[in-house]
Amino acid sequence: LNELFKIGDIIYVKYLNNNKYSLKQIPKANGGIVVMDPYTGRVLAMSGGFSFKKSEFNRSSQALRQPGSAFKPFVYALALENNYTPSTLILDAPIVLNQGVDLKKWKPENYGKKFYGLSTLRTGVEKSRNLMTVRIAQEIGVDKIAKFSEQLNIYENPEELISMSLGSAETTLLKLTSAYCSFVNGGKLIQPILVDRIQDSEGFTIYNSEKRECKNCKDVSYLSKNLPRIEDDLSLI
C-alpha cells in the first residue's frame, strides 16, 4: 500500500469484517444491467450505473449503444423464417462491399481475422461469424432485418445499412433485453414492466400490471386433477 498511497490521501474503502477493509474506487467506466422475467416482462433488477448520486443518467434505459454481436441472433432467427435451416451452408470468406459515392469500400472481418469456408448456419451463430452474418443479410435483405428489428422494438426507424446486421445501429439495454425474452417464451413480444402494482392506503389495488387470466382457477381444487391454466394475449412476432 505504501507504493500506492501516501499520508494524507483520501481513499474509498469497504468494510468487510473483524475490522478489515478492502480498497474501493469509483470506476472510470460505468455500465448497466437488466434482469427480466421473459414470460411477464417484469423487470426484476436494473442498475444504470455505479452511483445515482454522482450520475442520475440510467445506462440501462437511456444510454444508446451499439449492440454489436448481441444483435446477430436476431439476424439468424430471421434467416430461419426465410427458409434457412440450421444445416444450411453459408460461405465464410472475405467480402468487399460498396458503401456509396465517395465512400471507402467496406471490408468486414471475423474476430481473429480468419475465415473458414462453407459453414452451417448453426456454426455461424455459435461462433458469431461476421462474414456469414453479412452474407445472410445480403440474401434476405436489409429491409427485412430493419422491419424485424422494429417489430421487436429494438430500433425505431433504423437506417437500412447492411452493417446493421452486425449491430451497428443504437438501442438501449432495456429494449435489447426485452427482445431477447422472445427467444425464451416462444416468440412472444414482451413489454418491460417496472411497476408491478399500485395500492392505496387501505390496501385496495388501483393498478395491476398483470394482464393474464386464469380461466379455470375456480374449477381447480386440492384434489382436482386439473391444473391452473394461465393464458395471455401477447402477440407472436
Question: What do these predicted ranges mean?
Answer:
Residues 39, 84-145, 189, 201-237:
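Conserved catalytic neighborhood of penicillin-recognizing serine enzymes
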Residues 103-108, 141-178:
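Mid-domain, small-residue-enriched loop/turn segments at the edges of structured enzyme/sensor domains
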Residues 54-65, 163-166:
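Short helix/strand-bridging catalytic loops that position acidic/His residues to coordinate divalent metals
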Residues 78, 82, 127, 135-139, ...:
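Generic, well-ordered alpha-helical scaffold segments in large soluble proteins
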Residues 50-51, 79:
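Conserved structured catalytic cores and adjacent interaction surfaces
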Residues 1-34, 46, 53-57, 127, ...:
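A penicillin-recognizing enzyme superfamily signal
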Residues 6-10, 28-31, 38, 52, ...:
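Extracytoplasmic
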